[in-house]
From Swiss-Prot:
Residues 377-386 are annotated as: Important for oligomerization and fimbrium assembly. The keyword 4Fe-4S does not apply. A lipid is attached at residue 19 (S-diacylglycerol cysteine). It comes from Porphyromonas gingivalis (Bacteroides gingivalis). It is found in: Fimbrium; Cell outer membrane. This is Major fimbrium subunit FimA type-2. Residues 1-18 form the signal peptide. GO terms for biological process: cell adhesion.
């Protein structure tokens, strides 16, 4: 592994070029201590890509702070530990991040690092390389070798022995794991549904990287739908991105269909902003043939389809939302928010016609049942009846 050292005196400008090296610029090159850090990561689980990718640590970075000033920074590729970080003895703060990409961390103060944010992008829809953070931790380093989270066999000063530092994904995962059309007796001989697309709606655009809650005050949101709905949940600052939409593929536990999203608190700022996972398609006759013009007019007047000559309909699921149509199993998580490092797996049962506006509140008697599992990741299963 190539190692590069940058002497800050007279060469500070060169430090910024080190962000993609295995070993980042180390602000302190002379010291009487080293620290090695080993991590505990969440168990791998099924990814949108290859299994295990969601837990992959492609680049691990450890920063050591003396007060506000960065004393050392070091990275390792494809590793869950960083060893022999040169620093000095005394009270220090450790900050650990993974999969930071091109983020420039060398030389940042502790306050600057804690204030970092991230955005939801097309690049973070890949299972591999999900950004992860651990909350800053206070440690006391002694002269010589220090070890954080090791088993004690190394000797030296053992900190948090046998309890590695836990690092968590900044993103959450929302996905359908089952979609079943079982029309109720009232509709069984009248209607069916032909799915076409899956979208994420009202997805938070930005997130903090550190803090008890990562939901920030920025009121910008993203949608995968090209349609403007102007519903009660529609944000004012709303941007379409095609990568929050996908063609319909039958989901399963082994092949979940969904997206990675950021932490969000639904009642924050301008009003209720629930993150929505939505399936779009066509309302048809019970045998799958197109509706007649009279049937489309009736369905449009009922608010089920978008126009009297267009049978497009939507089945929105408000993820981790409180509703009599929703039941939950798995990890307990407070409703009304998207929480980092959780996967929200949704089992959807369609029992009747959908809606022409997925960004409006749905009545409790709507034809949707949701069962959501939250998992560790932390896992939530949401069962939905429509």
């Amino acid at each position: 592994m190539k190692k590069t050292k940058f002497f800050l005196l007279g060469l500070a400008a060169l430090a910024m070029t080190a962000c993609n090296k295995d070993n980042e610029a180390e602000p302190v090159t002379e010291g009487n201590a080293t620290i090695s850090v080993v991590l505990k990561t969440s168990n791998p689980n099924r990814a949108f890509g290859n299994a295990g990718d969601e837990a992959k640590v492609a680049k691990l970075t450890v920063m050591v702070y003396k007060g506000e000033q960065q004393e050392a920074i070091k990275s390792a590729e494809n590793a869950t530990k960083v060893e022999n970080i040169k620093c000095s003895a005394g009270q220090r703060t450790l900050v650990v991040m993974a999969n930071t990409g091109g983020m420039e961390l060398a030389g940042k103060t502790l306050a600057e690092v804690k204030a970092l944010t991230t955005e939801l992008t097309e690049g973070n829809q890949e299972a591999a390389g999900l950004i992860m953070t651990a909350e800053p931790v206070e440690v006391t380093l002694v002269a010589g070798n220090n070890y954080y989270g090791y088993d004690g066999s190394q000797g030296g000063n053992q900190i948090s022995q046998d309890t590695p530092l836990e690092i968590k994904r900044v993103r959450a995962r929302i996905a359908f794991t089952k979609i079943e059309v079982t029309m109720s007796q009232s509709y069984a001989n009248k209607y069916n549904f032909a799915p076409e697309n899956i979208y994420a709606l009202v997805a938070k655009k930005k997130s903090n990287l550190f803090g008890a809650s990562l939901a920030n005050n920025d009121d910008a949101y993203l949608t995968g739908s090209l349609t403007t709905f102007n519903g009660a949940y529609t944000p004012a600052n709303y941007t379409h991105v095609d990568w929050l939409g996908r063609d319909f593929t039958e989901p399963s536990n082994n092949a979940p269909q969904g997206f990675y999203v950021l932490e969000s608190t639904y009642a924050q700022n301008a009003g209720l902003r629930p993150t929505i996972l939505c399936i779009k398609g066509k309302l048809t006759k019970h045998d799958g043939t197109p509706l007649s013009s009279e049937e489309m007019t009736a369905a449009f007047n009922a608010g089920w389809i978008v126009a009297n000559n267009d049978p497009t309909t939507y089945y929105p699921v408000l993820v981790n939302f409180e509703s009599n149509n929703y039941t939950y199993t798995g990890e307990a998580v407070e409703k009304g928010k998207i929480v980092r490092n959780h996967k929200f797996d949704i089992n959807l049962t369609i029992t009747g016609p959908g809606t022409n506006n997925p960004e409006n509140p749905i009545t409790e008697s709507a034809n949707l049942n949701v069962n959501c599992v939250v998992a560790a990741w932390k896992g939530v299963v949401q069962n939905v009846i429509w």
